[in-house]
Curated annotation (Swiss-Prot):
One of its GO terms (molecular function) is ABC-type transporter activity. This is ABC transporter G family member 47. Residues 501-714, 1132-1346 form the ABC transmembrane type-2 domain. ATP 2 binds at G852, V853, S854, G855, A856, G857, K858, T859. It comes from the Eukaryota. ATP 1 binds at G189, P190, P191, G192, S193, G194, K195, T196. The chain crosses the membrane at residues 519-539, 565-585, 607-627, 638-658, 663-683, 692-712, 751-771, 1152-1172, 1183-1199, 1239-1259, 1266-1286, 1298-1318, 1321-1341, 1373-1393. Keywords: ATP-binding, Membrane, Nucleotide-binding, Repeat, Transmembrane, Transmembrane helix, Transport. One of its GO terms (cellular component) is membrane. It is a multi-pass membrane protein. The keyword Transmembrane helix applies. It comes from Oryza sativa subsp. japonica.
Amino acid sequence: MDGGGGETYGCGGGRREGGWAWAAAAADSVFSRSSSSAREDDEEDLRWAALEKLPTYDRARTALLALPPDGELREVNVRRLAADEQRALLERVAGVADDHAGFLCMFKERLDRVGIKLPTIEVRYENLNVEAESYVGSRGFPTIFNTYANIFEGLGNALHITRKKKQKISILHNVSGIVKPHRMTLLLGPPGSGKTSLLMALAGTLPSTVKVSGTITYNGHTMDEFVPQRSAAYVSQHDLHMAELTVRETVSFSAKCQGVGHHYDMLMELLRREKEENIKPDPEIDLYLKQKAEVVTNHILKILGLDICADTIVGNNMVRGISGGQKKRLTTAEMLVTPGRALFMDEILTGLDSSTTFQIVNSIRQTVHILGGTTIIALLQPAPETYELFDEIIILSDGQVVYNGPRDHVLEFFQSIGFKCPERKGVADFLQEVTSRKDQKQYWTHGDSTYRYISAAEIAEAFQSFHVGQAVRTELVVPFGKGKSHPAALRTSKYGVSMKELLQANIDREILLMKRNSFLYIFQAIRLTVMAINTMTVFMRTNMHRDSIENGRIYMGAQFYGMLMIMFNGLAEMGLAIAKLPVFFKQRDLFFYPAWTYSLPSWILKTPISFLNTIVWVFLTYYVIGFDPNIERFFRQFLALFVMSEATSGLFRFIASLTRDPVVASTMGSSCILISMLSSGFILSREEIKKWWIWGYWISPLMYALNTLAVNEFLGNSWNKTISGFSEPLGRLVLESRGFFPEAKWYWIGVGALLGYVILLNVLYTICLIFLTCTVDVNNDEATSNHMIGNSSSGIKGMVLPFVPLSITFEDIKYSIDMPEALKTQATESRLELLKDISGSFRPGVLTALMGVSGAGKTTLLDVLAGRKTSGYIEGNITISGYPKKQETFARVSGYCEQNDIHSPNVTIYESLMFSAWLRLPTKIDSATRKMIIEEVMELVELYPLKDALVGLPGVSGLSIEQRKRLTIAVELVANPSIIFLDEPTSGLDARAAAIVMRAIRNTVDTGRTVVCTIHQPSIDIFESFDELFLMKRGGEEIYVGPLGQHSCELIRYFEAIEGVSKIKHGYNPSTWMLEVTSPMQEQKTGVNFTQVYKNSELYRRNKNLIKELSTPHESSSDLSFPTQYSQPFLTQCLACLWKQRLSYWRNPRYIAVKYFFTIIVALLFGTMFWGIGQKRNNKQALFSAMGSMYSTCLTMGVQNSASVQPIVSIERTVFYRERASHMYSPLPYALGQVAIELPYIFLQTIIYGMLVYAMIGYEWSGAKFFWYLFFMYFTLSYYTFYGMMAVGLTPNYNMSTVVSTGFYTMWNLFSGFLIPLTRIPIWWRWYYWICPVAWTLNGLVTSQFGDVSDKFDDGERVSDFVKNYFGFHHELLWVPAMVVVSFAVLFAFLFGLSLRLFNFQKR
């Protein structure tokens, strides 16, 4: 079946026509049988005969393998290969990618010989409609006001009081078509046309929030008759992977979960028939079919060119890993191992060079044609040679199918309605642009009639009358007979392998992740050890006595603190769990595994860590503090704390899975800690808890834990003595004073309750994973259709601002990094060199393309030249117009569009550009001119209609990939730089958007600027818009640096003159040809070292002379200098940063709105639990309870503020690194803006909390006392918030900041003066009391409320005297704690700014 698909693969004679250079190694196929001796053949025949006598079950697990070096045949169990056997097998099969078609043909022939047919799938969709509901306009902004309005509106809708204000958005409108097996289908359409929604609908992966109508069938079966996620594979355009795993581990995990190779029943049938017909299979094919994940994984990695980075971690924005193009291929590889027969692939090749793109698509095409797969691939800029690989074309525009049929007829159809593709125009580019309102007119050929815009609806209607459309409609009328469907085509089981194998795969992965995060766990253990040492020296037995109930309270305080330490130690589990959830939800929805196989390892494998941490704590503290010396009670305390640790870890995992957001999770986690603490029986005794809160006491895990620990300690022999005035043992008195149960059975009741919580919370964690969905907005790119946006300006008037044209030269540039651990055993050098003696020059008015295959070092070179590298070793000379480059001044005159589009998520496009222009344009540019520049740049990159759209987070919300890319370019263009580096500016854009961007870049160059672009898949038009080419090969070496010439004539002449290089075909894309003929495989085949050829050429000598000339400054020139380090003065920087932070905070309800909601809940909780306790001044217990409310407030409200701000600062810090590298501002204004914006929100939080709590607790209504209460609360919340910021600034990532912060929370808790007063703290630790901010807060709050009270307790002691004698608080010195808490807030804010200035944790 050809149907216009270009070449056709036949299994009898290999490829029938033509041949691309990359796949010309068929003669050396690893599957060709060598002419061995007769003796060896006889031996092999005998071994095969022995294998055939085995039962079929055993035969499926046994194969023959030739071991190097002498080819010794060995009978192996494919399920349990030894290390040398695995190595030999991988070497034998490693060459399959060199002749992928040959390998597939051999496999197909093996099936054909015994009459086994492979299953195929025909997908039909009829009258398919997809709709979504969304708020539009300003109501769609996630502001605090809108958030609360949405909540009330949702309640109103549920009660049928109000009507819905969401508007329906049509994504796909009444589309129909057929996708057939053995056919490669290309899906084209501009962003926002509905491509992603169509692919997800066909794959059965659309979210439930989207309304779908119409019919989709596979082989005549509707989707409720089988499992579409197992029968098909959807490859997302969003790259979601575990950053800590390597490429090989990621693909291998997918293979283990989905079941690789071919269905087990088919393999058994194949072996049975071969045995009956006495057929001896090819040994490598036999091994490949029987092997599990390892061989298939390596095969896929080889095909996709990922074998070179197979053992490199994936990485993320903060951790260096694989490149963007490699990450995109990894997303494809993860799904290619699926046994599904239908593939729906969404923009899978963004960021890849045209040669690599061609190779990958061709490999997929070979698989589809030979094995009968069904495939739709959405591509943005397919090169002509890649376009020719497809058999069928689907074109979407405005949610309508305007063409669905053979590639051969698509141009005929558009000619029939008056549009013709120009001769040197890529057909795919033409098809992308012909439906566009802006570009359609240039293709109009009906000169006898006046042109008018023909809409997508009109084109779709015309297609129905075209003969292809009529044929599709006719075929749809006849249903596909279900009886024709192969029994194995559609999967009816949810999962690919047994539950045992899925559980084992998740266990193996969890162990790997724990190893990669081992530093975190080691740091936790070290921190716990330090805290244990601190605790045992604070509560040292020499200072601990057993002669009063008050002393018993100190012992109980040590137990309570130990519980909190163990509890807080599990807090980091929340952040780790949330970080993994996006990948989990993706894999769960694709039926990689059931949720319980994921949740069980994450619980069970953390248990040994809890066990060891508890041992450390109990072993260090138990005897030194002086708990009961009975060894049995020692182990009982260990058991109680261990079970409590498991329960609280389960609680934090449950919160993570329930909220799925770090900010909301930290708030909810703080609420749970607060409720557990207040109802534990320590802060408030059981008798003091109000009757309406007693239920909280009975369900609190901390109550059972503390009751268990207290019973274990105070019923011991050490406390079995009486004191004067009492007949009961002291231990029972201590227990009864706090309302605990003084019976020994309560130890086991408590342990049993905690075990119940362990099970319950982990079950709830699993239930959340089963039923809840990811918070990612999957369809954000479809809901913002933006491709019909009227006319835009043709030039950049605003870019014609005064600037100094600058050239940049670089000579003998070397860049190396420390040798990765994985390569140290194989390498003799201590460093890995990524750039090798690179030399060149970029000049004003010259547009240079920086090209090369993936891994050539293009981005690395740009990073080095732009000064963006933060690690590694750089050698060589870089000059700017003849003067040595100085990064401080260079950053002022250069712009760098990074490959990763990093922007603040909560500002609009216009605001992002305003911020960049405000800080980077000179001070003499007034606001009107600045606004004009911004608007013209937005018009230029066609973002003007979206100027009020929020940027959002990549893959989560806001702008689509291509809109984000255009914003990245616009942010740099508004800065009016002299030198611009653009790293893959057209990746992720469709052909039309790429052309728009290149026109903008060309206009920029024509103003006399120096512009360098890395580019991967340029069309002929785009490639020939460049003036010069800087071509690199893998390994970081240049192979051509020079002009392109008219129609690339200079480039073609240079390479065609090299012996062994094939001539370019007529009409072939020069960029694709150039990459093909210089590929590593061609270098190996022809024996040509293109680097040496270049360095021996006249062109190289000419370039060296040019570098020498440009490296010498002109006599009239001067070195680049500016009167100030930054474009704008310090005050303007502060105002700009504060302006952006104000917008970001107002539109961040998950932080601000949740914070206020939490504040109100906590205030009501405290007020109702401590109701009226401030008025009770007749006994000391009431004072302790009032102080307990203050202590709990500081701990919970403060920790919540600190924990919730950390993910916000962490996200913005990534943006800060980019903006600081561009010298937009210094770190101090940024830090001031981040700090200052918090102050009004904290003030409002303080007022809300203070008004509610002060009145409900019943403190004395005095103006001074109320002021001091608000004063200390405000600065306490402030220093906690700023401490959270500081912790992020001092640590490399959010998870580590959480661990570090938790250590200080617990230290502050210990030395706050509540668990153990100052007068009882050992002398050697009192210094820490004086530097503990919480101690000063409690000092201020207690002193201001009770330090001047003259009322007397029952025993006759004045309240003010007790406060002075017991706590050491002096009312006349109230100004001291006031000054100290203010100083702590200022100190932490200052250290936050200092950390931003001194540390850069971004590894590049």
